[in-house]
Each structure stands twice: as C-alpha cells, then as structure tokens.
UniProtKB/Swiss-Prot annotation:
Cellular compartments annotated: Plastid, Chloroplast
Entry keyword set: Chloroplast, Plastid, Ribonucleoprotein, Ribosomal protein, RNA-binding, rRNA-binding
Principal subcellular localization: plastid
Its job: Component of the chloroplast ribosome (chloro-ribosome), a dedicated translation machinery responsible for the synthesis of chloroplast genome-encoded proteins, including proteins of the transcription and translation machinery and components of the photosynthetic apparatus.
Protein name stated in the entry: Large ribosomal subunit protein bL20c
GO molecular function per UniProt: rRNA binding; structural constituent of ribosome
Biological processes per GO annotation: ribosomal large subunit assembly; translation
InterPro entries, A to Z: Ribosomal_bL20, RIBOSOMAL_L20_CS, Ribosomal_protein_bL20_C
Family label: Belongs to the bacterial ribosomal protein bL20 family.
Amino acid sequence: MTRVKRGYIARRRRKKIRFFASSFRGAHSRLTRTIAQQKIRALVSAHRDRDRQKRDFRRLWITRINAAIRERGVYYNYSKFIHDLYKRQLLLNRKILAQIAILNPNCIYMIYNEIIKKEDCKKYLEII
C-alpha cells in the first residue's frame, strides 16, 4: 500500500490549532494531539465561565449596593431598597446602582432619601 502524507489540508488544520494554542505551556503548545485536547478543554472552560462571570458580577453589585445603603441607615438594607425602587417605578439596574454607590455616594444617598421620604409620608397617612 502506498503512503499518503495528507499534504496541504492536514498541515493547514494543524497550523490553525497550533496558532490557537501558541500561548499554552509545554507540550500543550507543541504536540498536535495534546493541543487538540487542550483546545476543547479551553473552549469548554470559556463557555462555562461566561455564565459564571454574570453570576459573580451580579453578586458583586448587590454587595456594593448593600454596603452603601447600610452606611446610611441601620435598619435599611438592600432588599428593602430594591423593593422600594420597584414600588416607586425607578428603573435603575443593579450595575448602574453599584457604579453610583462607588463613584458618587451622594447621589445614592439622594435616591435613598427620596424613597424614605415617600415611604414615611405613606406610613404617616396610614396612621392618621
């Protein structure tokens, strides 16, 4: 049986996956079979961690908002704040609120005070 060297097509395929793995260490960037396995593994990790990143950032935003709110009022926390925002129909998402809490704390205190004023007025009217 004659030997087939596969030629251009196989070389092009190997070159493509070698380029992908050029930053990997050791055999993971040199051996074709190992490169193919590590490429699959890298893509799986990237896919999984895109979802994990969304969860992690949401958790970070919530922590930052909660810290900023609790500085102001001892009895007031994140869940009450978000609930009152929805009742007032203030459409600010968690990412924006966290940025405001970090970069401009006075602004988040203004939002907080607006909500508190309206809530206190409603409670006062209910008592009367």
